[in-house]
Amino acid sequence: MRINPTTSGPAVSTLEEKNLGRIAQIIGPVLDVVFPPGKMPNIYNALVVKGHDTVGQQINVTCEVQQLLGNNRVRAVAMSATDGLTRGMKVIDTGAPLSVPVGGATLGRIFNVLGEPVDNFGPVDTRITSPIHRSAPAFIQLDTKLSIFETGIKVVDLLAPYRRGGKIGLFGGAGVGKTVLIMELINNIAKAHGGVSVFGGVGERTREGNDLYMEMKESGVINEKNIAESKVALVYGQMNEPPGARMRVGLTALTMAEYFRDVNEQDVLLFIDNIFRFVQAGSEVSALLGRMPSAVGYQPTLSTEMGSLQERITSTKEGSITSIQAVYVPADDLTDPAPATTFAHLDATTVLSRGLAAKGIYPAVDPLDSTSTMLQPRIVGEEHYETAQRVKQTLQRYKELQDIIAILGLDELSEEDRLTVARARKIERFLSQPFFVAEVFTGSPGKYVGLPETIRGFQLILSGELDGLPEQAFYLVGNIDEATAKAMNLEGEKK
């Protein structure tokens, strides 16, 4: 971490005092630069090309050194378009890796991979910056306690609990509620844990990034009137950007999150959407650098690159970074090297189901497909584990009976199976819940449900104590007391 004397970035004059080289070759987003003998920059150093193109337009391109080629030449990858660059242009070695602004000044703002604001709200306080390349915390700094990260979302906390400082894979297609779930998690961590969030948009659509920003402003996660009260910082490296930017934007977001964890000692949520695009960008850069491709055309350094990002996401004695990563699975092939390498790092998976979304059950988290390594009696306790297993068994039996119901109808089932179906339908509805960030759209107030309340509610449904209540009473409520109150209201309306 570096504390700069002024609030502005390094000026051109101070940069020009440093080491100077010249462009020898340009291959798309890759530059070869010649430096004087004995003045070679280090790997990962940031290089800056400043000047004017043939029509007099200002050029300012930042690159990152990737290879030392010999004969005083280095190969660097550009973080922005290389249009207008020519051979012989001056290149300044900054003498350090890319550094980005960190701290409270980043909240409510949108940054690019270089840590420059791109939201038209003026400059950001850059007195405190941090390099994007850092080693993972040492073993002695790690917090090895296995503790659950309570989200206040019933289906997640009960059936696929998140680990504090863990990594969660979020699987879901378009239109099943990924964005709303992400925003609710950002909102809940701010309210319940006093934490902040960092969102890294890696190689996804610019339109989606814009939609997310607008929805965050609408729901209050980003407070336009008082930016400092916002709960999230956004870092975007979208699909239209060069592979260098898409490969490094995840590290920029992670660096901002690390500051909140290590210096502010907060619990941080780090969202990466999409981790597959990080691998994809690495694959493009690898080919541009002339490395031999590995399995399915991916880079030979796939595991190393993934590990260097994932190992920095962890709990230390100061605070925690809990990461939720959207995972795109190419051609639905889970054995593809990119998702397969990602799975090795995940502690839990949250799978969103189009079938549940079609039924109007939100959050549309699939209770049978979502998994967590935390769901063990020694970690969550016997009561939680037993309740979760019984909920899953009931839902699984309901799933098995659905074909019979579709062909023969409910009446052909045994008494026991009919009871199972009735309870499963109540459970399915009770797994839905109104979200704070959806209040503006639905008009119903959001609910945060603590874990003990969640367990109690499902125990009451499973025990049969609530068999007499209509299943509609369990739909979009918070805790079980609200469901019983809703049932009484429904009764009153009938009379």
Curated annotation (Swiss-Prot):
GO terms for biological process: proton motive force-driven mitochondrial ATP synthesis. The keyword ATP-binding applies. InterPro entries: AAA+_ATPase, ATP-synt_VA_C, ATP_synth_F1_bsu, ATPase_a/bsu_AS, ATPase_alpha/beta_chains, ATPase_F1/V1/A1_a/bsu_N, ATPase_F1/V1/A1_a/bsu_N_sf, ATPase_F1/V1/A1_a/bsu_nucl-bd. It catalyses: ATP + H2O + 4 H(+)(in) = ADP + phosphate + 5 H(+)(out). One of its GO terms (cellular component) is proton-transporting ATP synthase complex. Gene3D superfamilies: 2.40.10.170, Bovine Mitochondrial F1-atpase, Atp Synthase Beta Chain, Chain D, domain 3 (1.10.1140.10), P-loop containing nucleotide triphosphate hydrolases (3.40.50.300). Keywords: ATP synthesis, ATP-binding, CF(1), Chloroplast, Hydrogen ion transport, Ion transport, Membrane, Nucleotide-binding, Plastid, Thylakoid, Translocase, Transport. GO terms for molecular function: ATP binding; ATP hydrolysis activity; proton-transporting ATP synthase activity, rotational mechanism. Its EC number is 7.1.2.2. It is a peripheral membrane protein. ATP binds at residues 172-179. It is an enzyme of class 7 (translocase). It is found in: Plastid, Chloroplast thylakoid membrane. It comes from the Eukaryota. F-type ATPases have 2 components, CF(1) - the catalytic core - and CF(0) - the membrane proton channel. CF(1) has five subunits: alpha(3), beta(3), gamma(1), delta(1), epsilon(1). CF(0) has four main subunits: a(1), b(1), b'(1) and c(9-12). NCBIfam families: atpD. Produces ATP from ADP in the presence of a proton gradient across the membrane. The catalytic sites are hosted primarily by the beta subunits. Belongs to the ATPase alpha/beta chains family. HAMAP family: ATP_synth_beta_bact. This is ATP synthase subunit beta, chloroplastic. The gene is atpB.
